[in-house]
């Protein structure tokens, strides 16, 4: 076996281990923080500070009975968790943890990630359809509608970063950030994070698993290891979204004094903690509100961000960076407030004032 294949195999094992360990940490951190937000201790029995609780839960899932409904399409039912999980793992192949520390430095890295991430929804639909359960199918159909609605503003928000760097390579995008793009693209970051949270079904966009409406959504009929794969997929998606946000907007691995990988992981944790804070703060939206927020609010803002970015590229050489950052932040708040005045997500159906 050549050195290339040995290095590839070693990196794949390390990457898979990183994702699994990160998911366990994310689960523990989310449960502890949500507990604090709700004035309760959270998991605190298994190990010090409840650190072993995710491992105990994982063991419990692995040893549970794997039940397949008698009316289910058994082949599709069995395949769905794999179709949903594998694309999420493939996304990490093009994400740089440090300069050149990635499985492959694709010159179309961000395009590859967007393409691969879209396959996950097929696995979710397979799970909902094959279960022969109306709640599962309803959750899957909600997923498709939500993914299609929010994919457009997500791609347009990333396009602003591509315009600034002139590259689709994730590695080159990080190297181009002398100033983190969150300062030059605050509106793009807002649109990206909002759309990404909808894509990975985090509160307030978690309609496909709305317990009070459709039980557990698309994986209502799943148990055992198959359910564990879906659970792992959801948190791995959040990890991927946080890593992409770090790469595109927060300067990736760049930072003073400490090792680049440390900075990259620290920024990922910062994004994830913000997502947890949003979950603890906001209630779940209705399906019509979610659709309206994507099409009537985020889509116009993402288009406005492209226009602003084009002006930045034209006039940036003549404007001080600090002034440009101030203008961008002011424009972002102005546009968000303007659109929030036009579109009201209050009682009844969403309407234009």
Swiss-Prot record:
Coiled coil: none annotated. One of its GO terms (biological process) is aerobic respiration. GO terms for molecular function: NADH dehydrogenase activity; oxidoreductase activity, acting on NAD(P)H, quinone or similar compound as acceptor; quinone binding. One of its GO terms (cellular component) is plasma membrane. It is found in: Cell membrane. It catalyses: a quinone + NADH + 5 H(+)(in) = a quinol + NAD(+) + 4 H(+)(out). Its EC number is 7.1.1.-. The keyword Flavoprotein does not apply. The chain crosses the membrane at residues 8-28, 75-95, 108-128, 148-168, 179-199, 229-249, 258-278, 297-317, 319-339. It is an enzyme of class 7 (translocase). It is a multi-pass membrane protein. Keywords: Cell membrane, Membrane, NAD, Quinone, Translocase, Transmembrane, Transmembrane helix, Ubiquinone. InterPro entries: NADH_UbQ_OxRdtase_su1/FPO (IPR001694), NADH_UbQ_OxRdtase_su1_CS (IPR018086). The keyword Cell cycle does not apply. It comes from the Bacteria. NDH-1 shuttles electrons from NADH, via FMN and iron-sulfur (Fe-S) centers, to quinones in the respiratory chain. The immediate electron acceptor for the enzyme in this species is believed to be ubiquinone. Couples the redox reaction to proton translocation (for every two electrons transferred, four hydrogen ions are translocated across the cytoplasmic membrane), and thus conserves the redox energy in a proton gradient. This subunit may bind ubiquinone. NDH-1 is composed of 14 different subunits. Subunits NuoA, H, J, K, L, M, N constitute the membrane sector of the complex. HAMAP family: NDH1_NuoH. Belongs to the complex I subunit 1 family. This is NADH-quinone oxidoreductase subunit H.
């Amino acid at each position: 076996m050549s050195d290339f294949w040995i290095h590839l195999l070693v990196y794949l094992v390390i990457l898979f281990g990183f994702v699994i360990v990160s998911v366990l940490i994310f689960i523990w951190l989310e449960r502890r923080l949500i507990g604090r937000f709700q004035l309760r201790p959270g998991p605190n029995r298994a190990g010090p500070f409840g650190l072993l609780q995710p491992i105990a839960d994982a063991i419990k899932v692995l040893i549970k009975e794997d039940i397949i409904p008698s009316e289910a399409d058994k082949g599709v039912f069995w395949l769905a968790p794999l179709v949903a999980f594998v694309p999420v793992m493939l996304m990490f192949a093009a994400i740089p943890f440090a300069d050149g520390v990635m499985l492959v430095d694709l010159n179309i890295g961000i395009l590859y990630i967007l393409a691969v991430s879209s396959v996950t929804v097929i696995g979710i639909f397979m799970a909902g359809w094959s279960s022969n359960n109306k709640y599962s199918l309803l959750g899957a159909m909600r997923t498709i509608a939500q993914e299609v609605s929010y994919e457009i503003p997500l791609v347009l928000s990333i396009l602003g970063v591509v315009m600034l760097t002139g590259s689709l390579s994730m590695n080159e995008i990080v190297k181009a950030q002398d100033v983190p793009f969150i300062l030059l693209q605050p509106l793009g970051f807002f649109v990206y994070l909002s759309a990404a949270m909808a894509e990975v079904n985090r509160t307030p966009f978690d309609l496909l698993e709305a317990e009070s409406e459709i039980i557990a959504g698309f994986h209502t009929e799943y148990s055992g290891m198959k359910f564990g794969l879906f659970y792992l997929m959801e948190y791995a998606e959040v990890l991927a979204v946080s890593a992409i946000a770090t790469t595109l907007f927060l300067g990736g691995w760049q930072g003073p004094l400490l090792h680049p990988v440390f900075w990259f992981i620290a920024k990922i944790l910062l994004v994830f903690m913000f997502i947890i804070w949003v979950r603890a703060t906001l209630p779940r939206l209705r399906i019509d509100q979610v659709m309206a927020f994507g099409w009537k609010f985020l889509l116009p803002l993402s288009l406005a961000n492209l226009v602003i970015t084009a002006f930045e590229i034209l006039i940036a050489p003549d404007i001080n960076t600090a002034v440009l950052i101030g203008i961008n932040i002011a424009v972002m708040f102005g546009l968000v407030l303007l659109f929030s005045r036009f579109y009201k997500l209050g009682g009844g159906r969403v309407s234009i004032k």
